[in-house]
Curated annotation (Swiss-Prot):
The gene is acy3. It catalyses: an N-acyl-aromatic L-alpha-amino acid + H2O = an aromatic L-alpha-amino acid + a carboxylate; an N-acetyl-L-cysteine-S-conjugate + H2O = an S-substituted L-cysteine + acetate. InterPro entries: AspA/AstE_fam, Aspartoacylase, AstE_AspA_cat, Aste_AspA_hybrid_dom. Plays an important role in deacetylating mercapturic acids in kidney proximal tubules. Its EC number is 3.5.1.114. Its cofactor is Zn(2+). This is N-acyl-aromatic-L-amino acid amidohydrolase (carboxylate-forming). Keywords: Cell membrane, Cytoplasm, Hydrolase, Membrane, Metal-binding, Zinc. Binds 1 zinc ion per subunit. Belongs to the AspA/AstE family. Aspartoacylase subfamily. It is found in: Apical cell membrane; Cytoplasm. Zn(2+) binds at H20, E23, H113.
Length: 310
């Protein structure tokens, strides 16, 4: 029998929208909750709301100078700063000054994102965060919507440490919902995200009030590598995502399956040695990062029971 994980009660929760200024579900919800946060009140806490990148939101772009969600490295946050720094570096330091240092008083971060890929409901969690895994399991069982199936995608901690906004919290989840075009708010996606946030707050409140959550088993996806598009000698893309791969996020891709198609009609096949599970397939925001899809492996894990520490 696995040991029970004990964690301190959750006192400070922040719901973040607009980390990317053109991911509209979180933008719309954050703006609404900043005007009327009553929906975020629970018996044991009231969640705060943060509009993370307001200038990017105003311009309806992902970011101004650099990706805010890659701007929370120790190096950037600890730098003295200057007028020539990027807007996002300055904004990351502002957020850090308000909620930092990392993983201290801020107990839980819920960061709201959209993707143009067919990712359904994806819970992005840091590897080893059993508390967040319990939250994801609660959402999978209590907040079901067949139109947006749930998946858990674990984030590796880079060698230099966390760079994501959600790393400000001791525990965290990024809700990644799609497909949804950039700069567009879809009612079905927004409604789904709103329900997930409310259900997340219910879980945190139940935990604070002493509810014990039993151990469970679940499937998780872990990143193997990032695959670029085929490119010519000038660095230009010379093939697109194959129609048989498009929208097949989280489905198995076997050696010999088509992944790209050249403009002359030639298929490019997956030549790996083992089955993988592609995610973020043809994500619009990843073209600049030279990522056509992210290859993952699916593993099964046992998560120990959870209860509040007295």
């Amino acid at each position: 029998m696995s040991p029970t994980v004990q964690c301190g009660a959750v006192s400070q929760v922040v719901v973040v929208g607009g980390t990317h200024g053109n991911e509209m579900s979180g933008v719309c919800l954050a703006k609404h909750w900043l005007q009327d946060p009553s929906e975020l009140h629970r018996k044991s806490f009231t969640a705060e709301v943060l509009l993370a990148n307001p200038i990017a939101v105003e311009r309806c772009v992902r970011y101004i100078d650099r990706d805010l969600n890659r701007s929370f490295s120790h190096e950037l946050l600890s730098a003295s700063g200057s007028e020539s720094d990027s807007y996002e570096a300055k904004r990351a330091r502002e957020i850090y000054q308000k909620y930092g240092p990392k993983q201290s008083s801020l107990n839980f971060v819920i960061d709201l994102h959209n993707t143009t890929s067919n990712m359904g409901t994806t819970f992005l969690l840091f590897k080893g965060d059993n508390f967040a895994l319990h939250l994801a399991n609660y959402l999978q069982t209590k907040c079901v919507d067949p139109s947006f199936p749930c998946h858990i995608l674990l984030i590796d901690i880079p060698e230099g440490g966390h760079v994501h906004l959600q790393s400000m919290g001791k525990h965290s989840v990024s809700l990644e919902l799609g497909p949804q075009p950039q700069g567009v708010a879809r009612a079905d996606v927004l409604t789904r995200m709103r329900a997930l946030v409310n259900c997340s707050l219910d879980f945190l409140d139940l935990f604070n009030q002493g509810t014990e959550f039993p151990s469970f088993e679940t499937d998780v996806h872990q990143v193997l590598y990032r695959a670029d598009f085929p490119r010519n000698e000038d660095g230009e893309i010379e093939a697109v995502i194959h129609s048989e791969l498009q929208d097949k996020d989280y489905l198995p891709l076997k050696p010999g399956d088509p992944i790209f198609q050249r403009l002359n009609g030639e298929d490019i096949l997956y030549n790996g040695e083992k089955q993988i599970y592609p995610v973020f397939i043809n994500e619009a925001a990843y073209y600049e990062k030279k990522v056509a899809f992210i290859a993952t492996e699916k593993t099964h894990c046992l998560v120990p029971a959870l209860k509040v520490q007295n």
